[in-house]
């Protein structure tokens, strides 16, 4: 019986990995230019990190985490998101005790159980950033602008930035009560999950994907109409800064995000080119998450962007190269007896100088080797022929024109190295 990848997971094959490398290269350049340093946390954490960090009332913790006990009886969870693990690392290593703000980024796989869909996998990849120690609106605006800059560098179009403020512990209780009073008469018609959310955290009802729940919550009180002065001023400043930077956005008073730790600014980026599951990233401020995980009062803000969704959007917008195979610089073809040692030695010399070299391993005819070279899209082929070797020469063919020239065997490595160095310059 053939064993396949687990449901909800996908292999990233050689023809696809080039696209991922493009994303990763863009991420590294972006983060360097914005002053972020990389952090890498374990793929699994103590379950308490997510129960205390993400929130016990969230769908993620209640329905979607991969939980298990190790042989020592410890409760562990495959990470469903990157913020809580980053906060755990911040506290464990006292990164907050140095110069502030602390600006971190990460990429890697996350895990959530759910019904697999085209853009909803059980193992998926995120690019995220976190900023700790800065509470002013300027860092909120920078984080949002940075997310949009990432998409812009990839060439993505037709994206919409949704923006909201969901208040803070000072003003949210009054809003929760107003929302609860609005929903109470309709409670019997809500889905079973939202009936439970009514008392635990009624804001989750606004995030429900059930169509009937969405209909029942139409006309509900909005967070922006219940903000305290501090939150209202903060939100006004964020909008002013985004306007000054030319970052377009749409206000969405139903946007609450799916995690309990958010305060004040919340945002989401959507693409209409990937179907109903249109979110390709989002984030917000979480000024009390560090305390919730046992640390001092350190404000934070960040985002998480789904990379599979980014790639799907790029594909649907025609931004992915159809031929994504790795291009080699040079192919070495062998023709005749006694050519292998020379060809192999030349290949190793060139590789050590940074030239990407492919060669034949299957003892094929010269004609078949040239077809292989064409498939690799190499600009040049070196033919190591039995007759030429007797004369101390090699043949260099330019694939674009078909022109050939002979080069001395003893000077071949230096000549070819200079050829590619000049092309790069």
From Swiss-Prot:
GO molecular function terms listed in the Swiss-Prot or TrEMBL record: ATP binding; catalytic activity, acting on a protein; histidine-tRNA ligase activity; transferase activity
EC numbers on record: 6.1.1.21
A cellular component annotation (GO) from this entry: cytoplasm
Domain of life: Bacteria
Keyword RNA-binding in annotation: no
Chief localization: cytoplasm
Keywords recorded for this protein, A-Z: Aminoacyl-tRNA synthetase, ATP-binding, Cytoplasm, Ligase, Nucleotide-binding, Protein biosynthesis
UniProt record, GO biological process: histidyl-tRNA aminoacylation
Subcellular location field: Cytoplasm
Catalytic activity: tRNA(His) + L-histidine + ATP = L-histidyl-tRNA(His) + AMP + diphosphate + H(+)
Quaternary structure and partners: Homodimer.
Family listed: Belongs to the class-II aminoacyl-tRNA synthetase family.
Protein name: Histidine--tRNA ligase
Origin species: Heliobacterium modesticaldum (strain ATCC 51547 / Ice1)
Gene: hisS
């Amino acid at each position: 019986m053939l064993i396949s990848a687990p449901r909800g997971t996908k292999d990233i094959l050689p023809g696809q990995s080039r696209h991922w490398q493009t994303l990763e290269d863009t991420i590294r350049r972006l983060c360097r230019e914005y002053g972020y340093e990389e952090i890498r946390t374990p793929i699994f954490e103590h379950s308490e990190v997510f129960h205390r960090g993400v929130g016990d009332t969230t769908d993620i913790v209640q329905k979607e985490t991969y939980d298990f006990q190790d042989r020592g009886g410890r409760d562990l969870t495959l990470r469903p998101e990157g913020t809580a693990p980053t906060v755990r690392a911040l506290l464990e290593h006292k990164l907050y005790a140095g110069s502030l703000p602390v600006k971190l980024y990460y990429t890697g796989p996350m895990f959530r159980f759910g019904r697999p869909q085209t853009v909803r996998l059980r193992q998926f990849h995120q690019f995220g950033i976190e900023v700790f120690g800065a509470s002013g609106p300027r860092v909120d605006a920078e984080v949002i602008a940075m997310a949009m800059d990432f998409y812009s560098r990839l060439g993505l179009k037709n994206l919409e930035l949704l923006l909201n403020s969901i208040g803070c512990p000072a003003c949210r209780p009054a809003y929760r009560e107003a929302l609860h009073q609005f929903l109470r008469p309709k409670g019997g018609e809500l889905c079973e999950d939202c009936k439970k959310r009514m008392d635990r955290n009624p804001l989750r009802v606004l995030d429900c994907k059930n169509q009937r729940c969405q209909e029942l919550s139409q006309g509900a009180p909005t967070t922006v109409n219940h903000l305290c002065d501090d939150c209202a001023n903060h939100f006004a400043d964020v909008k002013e800064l985004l306007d000054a930077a030319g970052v377009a956005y749409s206000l969405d008073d139903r946007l609450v995000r799916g995690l309990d730790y958010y305060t004040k600014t919340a945002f989401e980026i959507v693409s209409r080119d990937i179907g109903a599951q249109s979110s390709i990233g989002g984030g917000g401020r979480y000024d009390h998450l560090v305390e919730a995980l046992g640390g001092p009062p350190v404000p934070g803000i960040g985002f998480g962007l789904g990379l599979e969704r980014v790639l799907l959007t790029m594909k649907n917008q025609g931004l992915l190269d159809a031929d994504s195979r790795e291009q080699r610089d040079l192919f070495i073809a062998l023709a005749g007896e006694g050519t292998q040692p020379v060809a192999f030695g030349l290949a190793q010399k060139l590789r050590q100088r940074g030239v990407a070299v492919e060669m034949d391993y299957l003892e094929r005819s010269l004609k078949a080797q040239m077809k292989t070279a064409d498939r690799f899209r190499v600009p040049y082929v070196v033919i190591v022929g039995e007759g030429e070797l007797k004369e101390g020469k090699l043949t260099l063919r330019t694939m674009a024109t078909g022109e050939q020239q002979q080069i001395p065997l003893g000077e071949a490595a230096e000549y070819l190295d200079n050829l590619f160095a000049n092309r790069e310059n």
